């Protein structure tokens, strides 16, 4: 499961019912499929990043005849996690994922990628046009391929399309290097727009909301309420960004490190 062979796993942990913990010395991706399955089965899962840092610490001590405090291992590991781990945004169409992603990159040193925008740029078609010409299945394959590509990278803010959560493999890919944030906007605040093929009227939006909300809550590592007005004030924007960043750092400290 090491890059570039992400998604592969040497074994199925369901065949080891007495297993309590799994250590995978791979650190690229940060969570291999093996570690993801371990977490799903309630096992302790540890990657190889801390071991890499510890190895470097002892190598420096040996070759430079110096001493480094052991707590530096944890500090450096956490700093690396902050640099490497992606922030992934999921949620309903018009929940604010794209705008949140663009704003967030001004608060943290990461590059924003909007998967729908990448699809439009590379295909030469709008999402609406792609649906009309080729259907949803064709679009979902594009979406899968773009997510698969960017989820292998590090240091990104990835804003996904509203339906990305329909394919569990998308979530597995996004979680291998990312913390998933569910941008949760109440139904009455979601917009109906003609350029969104699956949410072009109020009834369609309500149906999507009912179908997808359980998936957003299932896959999100953190739920981020976003009922701020479209013309958001700087104070409100700061509040939203702080909620995301505090949650992100909390997850890195307690679930990843």
Model-derived features with residue positions:
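Rossmann-like adenosine-cofactor binding region
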Residues: 1-45, 164-170
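Adenosine-phosphate binding glycine-rich loop
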Residues: 21, 25-85
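NTP-dependent small-molecule kinase module
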Residues: 74-83, 99, 103, 107, ...
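Hydrophobic anchor at the beta1->P-loop junction of P-loop NTPases
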Residues: 89
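P-loop (Walker A) phosphate-binding loop of NTP-binding proteins
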Residues: 92
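Conserved glycine(s) of the Walker
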Residues: 96
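ATP-dependent small-molecule kinase phosphotransfer cores
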Residues: 114-172
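A glycine- and Lys/Arg-enriched "phosphate-lid" helix/loop adjacent to the NTP-binding pocket
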Residues: 177-215, 219
